[in-house]
Amino acid sequence: MNLTALKNIPVSELIFLGDNAGLENLARMRKQDIIFSILKQHAKSGEDIFGDGVLEILQDGFGFLRSSDSSYLAGPDDIYVSPSQIRRFNLRTGDTISGKIRPPKEGERYFALLKVNKVNYDKPENARSKILFENLTPLHANSRLRMERGNGSTEDLTARVLDLASPIGRGQRGLIVAPPKAGKTMLLQNIAQSIAYNHPDCVLMVLLIDERPEEVTEMRRLVKGEVVASTFDEPSSRHVQVSEMVIEKAKRLVEHKKDVIILLDSITRLARAYNTVVPASGKVLTGGVDANALHRPKRFFGAARNVEEGGSLTIIATALIDTGSKMDEVIYEEFKGTGNMELPLSRKIAEKRVFPAIDYNRSGTRKEELLTKSDELQKMWILRKIIHPMSEIDAMEFLINKLAMTKTNNEFFDMMKRS
């Protein structure tokens, strides 16, 4: 019996399974409690149980394997990991662990890890010799992440504009600057779908902080990847815990030479959460931001890097502007120069219902010559010269109309050459 397999089953089927196993009153329980009861029943019959999760080490030295299905929220189906196992395998918060588990004994509340089979999808012996993330050498992004799918659909137009306006590479630290209702969520969904389609080798994680519950459900259904969320009805401490778990998991995977991509919506709300949680230093910036509050969200965003030893961590985050809040403006100003790719969205374009509402002239990537071939780069620069005199609305309408005539950007450049 596998714990992860049970978590993927809908609640109605779990209740049916529980009824067959002779369990009662399951309909009134939370999903995690139902899973706990079913596993306990199977364990009594002597069946082997396996489970996995992401390790969170607490201050007392022991830890728990949390599940991404419940967005790393503590629950009855968490798996206890003893301090001796943590020391033996040199485990750290964020390690993805799978292994054999046992049911709780008399007086215990949680399932416990008996045997570690894999650490970060690798043998436990290999995990011990990994170089710490902080000791890895950061480089400029030099391997392109293409967004274009080449199927000629209207959704692909967004990806193609993105490829032209600001190319994304493995290890990019990108900021999508978005006013309200400019289509940032749609843009993130497009990026997520393009990555899943073109780069299935990358580990994709979508982190939604302070979002609406219905948007979380929509994102989970659309994105082939891990969607971790903390909705607006959760406390700030929960937003912080979720983001820490996601970034620690990403760092551990990069240590194992994996390419990880985090799409964060939004870094402004994350910074607000840290501002609430961090102890008051007495120094307050404009808009009510504590002087120490932005250190940890900057550390989150600054973790994005291309690594010389292999692997990369890409973070594409949205920053909110024009919300009427002075605090949001201060947070944006603090993050403004930290990224190496910027993609401003325009409210004017979105109000005319032209999507994607990208401000083409103001968007761009640093060191884009490392990501694009020289001939393609020349064509992109010529396109910028053509578009530069136009207003932001005219530029976007012109570009979308021309791109709609072709299926791929190469065809578009050929058409440009002929005309």
From Swiss-Prot:
**What EC number(s) does this enzyme carry?**
3.6.4.-
Where does the Rho RNA-BD domain lie?
A: 48-123
Pfam families reported in the protein's UniProt record = ATP-synt_ab (PF00006), Rho_N (PF07498), Rho_RNA_bind (PF07497)
- Read off the PROSITE patterns from this record: RHO_RNA_BD
Q: Where is this site: RNA-binding 2?
A: 326
Domain of life according to the entry: Bacteria
Q: Identify one Gene Ontology CC term for this UniProt entry.
A: cytosol
Which segments carry the region annotation RNA-binding 1?
61-66, 78-80, 108-110
Which region is the signal sequence?
Answer: none
Residues the entry annotates as binding ATP:
169-174, 181-186, 212
Instruction: List UniProt keywords, sorted A-Z.
Output: ATP-binding, Helicase, Hydrolase, Nucleotide-binding, RNA-binding, Transcription, Transcription regulation, Transcription termination
**What does the record give under GO molecular function?**
ATP binding; ATP hydrolysis activity; ATP-dependent activity, acting on RNA; helicase activity; RNA binding
* Cited SMART domains: AAA (SM00382), CSP (SM00357), Rho_N (SM00959)
List GO BP terms, alphabetically: DNA-templated transcription termination
Q: Where are the transmembrane segments?
A: none
Which top class of enzyme applies to this chain? hydrolase
Tell me the segments the record calls region RNA-binding 2.
284-288
Q: Function of this protein?
A: Facilitates transcription termination by a mechanism that involves Rho binding to the nascent RNA, activation of Rho's RNA-dependent ATPase activity, and release of the mRNA from the DNA template.
Assembly information from the UniProt record: Homohexamer. The homohexamer assembles into an open ring structure.
NCBIfam families from the UniProt entry: PRK09376.1, rho
UniProt lists the family membership as follows: Belongs to the Rho family.
- Under which name does UniProt file this protein? Transcription termination factor Rho
**Species this chain originates from:** Buchnera aphidicola subsp. Baizongia pistaciae (strain Bp)
